[in-house]
């Protein structure tokens, strides 16, 4: 494994313990899959968060998200982390960059899709993640169906090697279950791009991303062709 990715993942676990503290957010995405569902087949270097409360009107929800991000930054700064919130847009503060010792991780909240299909649950790091990252962490995590329903949409939309790898793990284990399919449809319908653009995207050349933003992240060697095959089978 690449040492920078390993250091980033270790930093991520320390950051997560100071961000996911009061139920405002839950973890989703690749970090949820690879550190809390799978026994760490790859490292993860960012925190993708969901705002589980779907009952609040949009403006009220955004205010709560912004407030929670600012509170997280304050907690992190008290522990010696450097934080930077990118320039706020009309949605306010929904991203936070956290740095320590030359390593940086990104926190990002999905403010478009608020709420989850299934209830959030508390989850602990898998054994391999605990041992490798030298951490012990229990935090709110989106359901298996939610994380993979969203991941399938992300893999189709972004075609990033990390997303495609996560999909290969799903195909190798459970496959697309009824629950995942239902969550996928909901996340697809909630996407900010037209459905047909997500389902039938123009295929991107992902070789550069594979070499510079993926290689060295997995516990076992992965060939680009395997990820391209996963993309073709989605």
Question: Where are the model-predicted features located?
Answer:
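Compositionally biased terminal segments of proteins
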Residues: 1-234
